[in-house]
A protein has these predicted regions:
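A short beta-strand-turn-helix
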Residues: 2-20, 60
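Thiol-based oxidoreductase modules, predominantly thioredoxin-like and allied folds used
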Residues: 4-6, 24, 36-61
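CheY-like receiver
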Residues: 12-13, 62-65, 100
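Short pre-active-site segment immediately N-terminal to redox-active cysteine/selenocysteine motifs
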Residues: 18, 25-28, 70
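Structural cue for short, hydrophobic secondary-structure segments
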Residues: 23-25, 76
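Short, thiol/selenol-centered motifs that function as redox-active sites or metal-ligating centers
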Residues: 28-35
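Structural micro-motif
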Residues: 60, 66-77
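Non-catalytic, surface beta->alpha helical segment in thiol-disulfide oxidoreductase systems
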Residues: 76-103
Length: 103
């Protein structure tokens, strides 16, 4: 999963990929650590989605830009025209995450 450290980097990543999932996380966050292997597995299965992650401790400005207040927070941008994305906060099971991503 690509590590994003700046807003410019995230914007470029979104320009390069039509369907993007962003994982806002922190290394000290227990639920965030539970989400990582789940997302890594989904990345292998759902190849139409480009996965990236933002460490909120290292890229606080990116988190602030998107109004991230809780972690883990996942933002899904299913197309390039979607500027706000849809948000999933907290840990969810794989079936619920797949349903969220495909709905």
């Amino acid at each position: 999963m690509k590590e994003i450290t700046t807003l410019e980097e995230l914007n470029k990543f979104r320009e390069e990929h039509a369907n993007v999932l962003v994982d806002f996380w922190a290394p000290w966050c227990g639920p965030c650590k539970m989400v990582i292997p789940l997302l890594e597995g989904l990345q292998e299965e759902m190849t139409d989605i480009a996965f990236c992650k933002v460490n909120i401790d290292e890229a606080a400005d990116v988190a602030t830009h998107f109004g991230i207040r809780n972690i883990p927070t996942l933002m899904h941008f299913p197309n390039k025209e979607d500027v706000s994305g849809k948000t999933q906060i907290g840990f969810v099971s794989k079936p619920k995450l797949i349903k969220w991503l495909t709905s």
